[in-house]
Amino acid sequence: MEALVYTFLLVGTLGIIFFAIFFREPPRIIK
């Protein structure tokens, strides 16, 4: 049960960091 919570927190923090970096600078990789 604790492992699930830890993995959820890890994925959440990584997702927040990824979206912060993605929205901070314009997506040049897609174009």
From Swiss-Prot:
Q: Which GO terms describe its cellular component?
A: chloroplast thylakoid membrane; photosystem II reaction center
Main location group = plastid
GO BP annotation list: photosynthesis
Q: Is Transmembrane helix there in the keyword field? A: yes
Q: Taxonomically, which superkingdom?
A: Eukaryota
Asked whether the keyword Manganese is assigned, the reply is no
Q: Where in the cell is it found?
A: Plastid, Chloroplast thylakoid membrane
InterPro entries recorded:
PSII_PsbT (IPR001743), PSII_PsbT_sf (IPR037268)
Residues passing through the membrane, by range: 3-23
Q: How does it sit in the membrane?
A: Single-pass membrane protein
Q: List the disulfide bonds.
A: none
**Keyword line:** Chloroplast, Membrane, Photosynthesis, Photosystem II, Plastid, Thylakoid, Transmembrane, Transmembrane helix
On assembly, the entry states: PSII is composed of 1 copy each of membrane proteins PsbA, PsbB, PsbC, PsbD, PsbE, PsbF, PsbH, PsbI, PsbJ, PsbK, PsbL, PsbM, PsbT, PsbY, PsbZ, Psb30/Ycf12, at least 3 peripheral proteins of the oxygen-evolving complex and a large number of cofactors. It forms dimeric complexes.
Q: Which family does it belong to?
A: Belongs to the PsbT family.
Q: What does this protein do?
A: Found at the monomer-monomer interface of the photosystem II (PS II) dimer, plays a role in assembly and dimerization of PSII. PSII is a light-driven water plastoquinone oxidoreductase, using light energy to abstract electrons from H(2)O, generating a proton gradient subsequently used for ATP formation.
Could you identify this protein by its name? Answer: Photosystem II reaction center protein T
Organism of origin is Mesostigma viride (Green alga)
Q: What is the lineage of its organism?
A: Eukaryota, Viridiplantae, Streptophyta, Mesostigmatophyceae, Mesostigmatales
Q: Which gene codes for it?
A: psbT
